[in-house]
Amino acid sequence: MSVFSKIFNAFKSIRLNDKNVVVGQQLDYLLVSSMYAEQQSAYLNSYETGLSKATIKKLLEEYWSVFDKETAIEILLDLQNRNEDKYINFVYDAFENKSNYVTILKSNLPAEEEIFRGYLDIYRNLNNVVPELIEENVIEDFAQIKRIKDAAWNYGRGAFLSRCCYEAGYLSESEMKEYLRKSFTNLKKYCSTWQEYTISYIFGRALWGGPNNSGMIQIADDLLHNEKSPLKNKKYL
């Protein structure tokens, strides 16, 4: 996809399928994929993404290293398991107690240098990400992030990838639906509203992808407020 096409697609909002529409509780499960789906200009209201086979193949292989059922399951499970990180709260505690952050991190994180440096990088990223999100009016304070974490970033990407894997033939329809259901159920442990879902996704994107997230913020606004959006009249997960 050319740079021009990506820019053009960024301004195309809310793509809906007029066939094979998902409704009811199943739609709620499906909408966990909505942030990533909007990034890719995919359908929001059907299991079918509306993307070409070539686009799906490129997304799976070049960006996610998914080539078959085995690698698909490996990546999808990893995205769900990332939310079970038992050390991340210590990083958040260190961020809230900056004068004592070294002691907090060294006392609670694994001693292995590579692992420790990984968490230290997260701590440093927080110092850039949190002020930016407050300035952009995405969050009011860090307390919002500490509760919802980047759960939607992980579950949301996994949910959309499961749809792509289904279309690529790596997951059965029942496997995809179960993955979407589980993603929704687990997401509710962190986010209680769809607005929190979008905030959590933006936070994850900012934490791992860097600054300049105005595009993601616009996507979230469209999902929550555009009259065509399936999320427009939904508040709670």
Predicted regions and their residues:
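Polar/charged low-complexity regulatory segments
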Residues: 2-166, 170-237
